Amino acid sequence: MKFVCDKSKLNEAISVVSKAVNNSCAIDILKGIKIDADDKLKMTGSDLDLSVESIIDAHVEESGSIIVDARIFSDIVRKLPDGDITIETDDQNEIKISCASTKFNILYLSSDGYPEIKKIDDGDSFKIYSSDLKNIIKSTIFAISNNESRPILTGSKFEINKSTLRVVSIDGYRLALRDQIIPETPYDGLSFVVPGRALNELLKILKDDSTIVTVTVRENSVMFAFDSFVIISRLLELYRYGGESVYYN
């Protein structure tokens, strides 16, 4: 594998996908970032509950797929000078990172055992502006519970009724609720509960602009897709049509 890409774009992608990496995980491969080089560069971080993917432009001279230690790779790229970075692998399981006169060599793992991150292509979906989603999360996330004895309250409930998105958070003492107008949907009573951790990471990436975020939900997962990012999280409560949430009554 060999590619050349801009340091600032690579650094941003690493910073984003690293948020899903659990450095204390007992499974070594999940401590790393998966790098797929083809027409573009795709980077993925996951701990199975939360997965984050970022795609950036790169000049790919030789395609390939590897796993690199998230912490080490992040530290190296962050310290490199601005400009184009060349990354190349060899047959000794080493990855060569060079920028101007600075060079680093680190080990990499095969990506063969990395879990497949399945995107949600055929679920129920709605669209919302990035700024609106950011504001509604910011206005309600403070009331999410930290008490793991009631895990359902460690997330926010999303409810979609036609052209209204309602987000509710409650920790047993405080309740935060906010409604947001969204483009018309066919749903009347679609609801699901998103973990606070996923919302925290999403909040760090969302921008205060009119970028369209597509939110797709199916069974026990939700996907937020916008720009070059995809965030997939397990739900705390399976999504449902109509009626009240069993746990949020």
Language-model segments: which ranges?
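Structural preference for solvent-exposed beta-strand-turn elements
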Residues: 1-249
